[in-house]
Amino acid sequence: MKLKNNNRKGSFLESAFILTISTAFVKLAGLLFTIPISNMLGGEGMGYFYAAYDIYNMLAVLASAGLPVAVSRMISETLVAGNTDEAERIYKVSLRIFTIIGAVIAFAMFFGADVFAAIIKSPNSGMSIRVLAVTAFCAFVMSSLRGYFQGHSIMTYTAVSQVIEALSKLILGCALAYVLLRTELAYVGGSAGAIMGVSVGAVLSVTYLLISKRRFSKSEKPSGMPVRGDKAIIKELFRIAIPVSLGASVMSLVNLIDTTVIMRVLQDGLGYTYERANWLYGVFGNAKKIFNFPSAFIIPFTVSILPVLTAAYTAKDKDGVAKNLTNCFKYAMLLALPAGIGITILAEPIMHIIYFRTPDEANAGAPILAVFGIAVILYAVVTISGAILQSFGQVGKPLISLCVGGVIKCVLNAFLVGIASVNILGAPIATCVCYAVMTVMNLCFLKKYMTGCRAIVTNTLKIAGASVVMGVFAYLVCSPLSAMLSVRKGGLIAIILAAAVYALLVVLFKIITIKEIKSVLRKGKK
């Protein structure tokens, strides 16, 4: 059965294109935020900043994982049958439930900030955790709104809301950090100030989405079809959301445990002072921030593929399923493979380009970033395969791999960080092993759905070949350029040249054709 065309909805590539553009802007803004903030706060201030975010990510993971996925999937299935009335009911019920959950989480973060800070043995991060409470509440409200639009395969509103958040974080976050850093609060205040910009951005983003939803609903025509009751909708909502949220919660909990384990092992196991351990954790966080940059570009593919694949799978459109699976893996690997290889090879110059005012942190973070480069590739496969399994209704399978990977990560972290010659480098190594195990498990779960998708293997091998050639080229030109100029200037030129070589190889290997590029750009303009 073929799906009917709907002009109001975007295809997978159109949706992914829109979100990729917004993600590029958001990440650029994030990079412009990270550079001054990290140079202002240094290792100590960034240690407070990242510790607060680990707490936030654990408590607010529901908002960014299971809940929007559940809303998107339910609305997508409902719209296949043309029942717009039920789509509206799903939104209203989800908004009511998510608002209550968000309020509870925000309350816990605000009044329990000092307790959380003590648990992770970073007492000075309490103020930053408290400021993030507003962001947590807004995140839950946004999950319902974004899930609604994503279920319609309309990504423009989500994209604009992300840009609003990014601009507020960049402008207000930097300004407030600068001001508070110069008060008696020093690094503690500077970290909290940077996070205040994030909270204001979340409020503005929610406001924009609510206004957009009201305007969009006015153009929706009632279907007059039967609608399920609230209890049935809530039951279905949590049936889908709980496994996905548990999976995301596992990784957030693992990251929180990592924070605690790393800080405790460095202090109690290796005998480092709190200041030294916090500095090392700040360096680790800086490298992880760069790892998150290319990894974030995989999210548009997972968000876009879920409603499209769900609709095709529900309609039993085998050709549509195969086509979208192939495209999803192809475009995700086009980004992840060169990014991962490039980061591994050019880790040192990348650290010095971004953290140019803190050379000690840049030098210490380079080996960490090099290992994270491998994790970029594995993360892409894990994320894409997990989203595909969710689209097919296999929401419990990714949870299994997440739990196994999470346990392995915790055990390896405790062991590797405790080795004096390895210490903080053990954290990214454990991350790589974790994602490698999850990759193998997810691909095994997906095997029976991959019939008719042989092009995925062919495309991946071509992309890997182009990426390796690019990596060798980058390695050969970076050293002499750095010797002639400087690590930063030589590295920057090497990155630009390597990107140009990769783009040329992609066309020469016929991984992507000029016709495909023009098609995507034309759809993006629409």
Feature names for model-found ranges:
Residues D114-L132, T326, T344-V376:
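Interfacial segments at transmembrane-helix termini and the short loops linking adjacent helices
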Residues S11-S72, A106, F110, T135-A136, ...:
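Signature of the first transmembrane helix
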Residues F140-Q162, I374-V404:
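Membrane-interface junctions at transmembrane-helix termini in multi-pass inner-membrane proteins
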Residues A65-V80, A287, S295-D319:
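Helix-loop junctions and terminal segments of transmembrane helices
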Residues M1-A29, D85, R89, P226-M251, ...:
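N-terminal membrane topogenesis motif
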